[in-house]
């Protein structure tokens, strides 16, 4: 059995690994490199213990590249006391950098004989592939190709009218296993450990309250109770929205 996947993204890479382990051949087609989304090195992903077990079943050992989180502390604005906390000696979840997980899965796939990938040069190539009898099944996880425009008319779009700011801080080495979220007046600010000396920052705020990079850094310094910050990485920002077709 052969399956065709459209889109070079984390979803399709993990799906490819699962399918191949089940004895199914995969051919991944994606837009040319200059059309692929730029890699965001600040982006992180949270994985539950069940997620980790599932991935390990398909030879994807995320624990080697992720940070185990065993505590979660929640604070209200300037309060020094938590209003809610979770503690588990084993682990509550893992945090891993998105690009590290992407690279890890992709390197494994490149070694598999049942995995192939090709560039798509123009829109008409998508339609030609759909007519080919080589594949028993097609999966499309690209949101901006002709397949969505031609076949999916009931797209669900949701604009949350909010902006997220993300960055990573370098700090002193410590046992960094506690995720912290502070509900500031502007919006939630999260400290998400990604190693013993690096922590990811995520701040979400209504678009009407947008801030600049320096204001974001000052906000982090104001609410930081845990780290001796050495430096910030580039501060990225993006609009929060949801798209389903």
Predicted regions and their residues:
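Glycine-rich FAD pyrophosphate-binding loop
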Residues: 6-8, 18-42
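Central beta-strand plus flanking loop segment that forms part of the substrate or channel wall
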Residues: 49, 147-179, 184-187, 195-197, ...
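Conserved Rossmann-like nucleotide-cofactor binding loop
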Residues: 11, 34, 145
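Conserved N-terminal helical subregion
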Residues: 53-57, 66-152, 156-165
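N-terminal glycine-rich dinucleotide-binding loop that anchors FAD/FMN and/or NAD(P) in oxidoreductases
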Residues: 41-64
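Hydrophobic anchor at the start of a short beta-strand
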Residues: 3, 20, 24-26, 62, ...
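FAD/FMN-dependent oxidoreductases across multiple families
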Residues: 209-245
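Beta1/beta-strand and adjacent pyrophosphate-binding region of the FAD-binding site
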Residues: 1-11
């Amino acid at each position: 059995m052969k399956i065709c996947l459209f889109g070079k993204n984390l979803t399709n890479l993990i799906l490819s690994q699962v399918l191949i382990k089940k004895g199914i051949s995969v051919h991944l087609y994606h837009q040319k490199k200059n059309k692929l989304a730029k890699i965001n090195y600040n982006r992180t992903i949270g994985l539950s213990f069940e997620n980790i077990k599932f991935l390990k079943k398909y030879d994807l050992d995320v624990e080697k590249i992720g940070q185990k989180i065993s505590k979660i502390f929640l604070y209200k604005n300037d309060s020094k006391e938590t209003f809610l906390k979770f503690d588990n000696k084993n682990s509550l979840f893992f945090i891993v950098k998105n690009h590290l997980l992407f690279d890890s899965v992709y390197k494994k796939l490149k070694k598999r004989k049942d995995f192939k990938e090709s560039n798509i040069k123009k829109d008409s190539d998508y339609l030609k592939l759909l007519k080919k009898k080589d594949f028993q099944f097609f999966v499309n996880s690209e949101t901006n190709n002709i397949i969505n425009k031609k076949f999916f008319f009931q797209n669900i779009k949701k604009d949350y009218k909010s902006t997220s700011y993300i960055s990573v801080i370098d700090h002193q080495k410590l046992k960094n296993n506690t995720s912290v979220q502070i509900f500031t007046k502007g919006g939630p600010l999260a400290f998400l450990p990604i190693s013993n000396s690096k922590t990811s920052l995520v701040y979400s705020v209504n678009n009407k309250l947008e801030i600049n990079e320096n204001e974001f850094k000052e906000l982090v310094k104001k609410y930081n109770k845990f780290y001796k910050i050495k430096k910030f990485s580039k501060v990225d920002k993006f609009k929060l929205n949801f798209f389903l077709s």
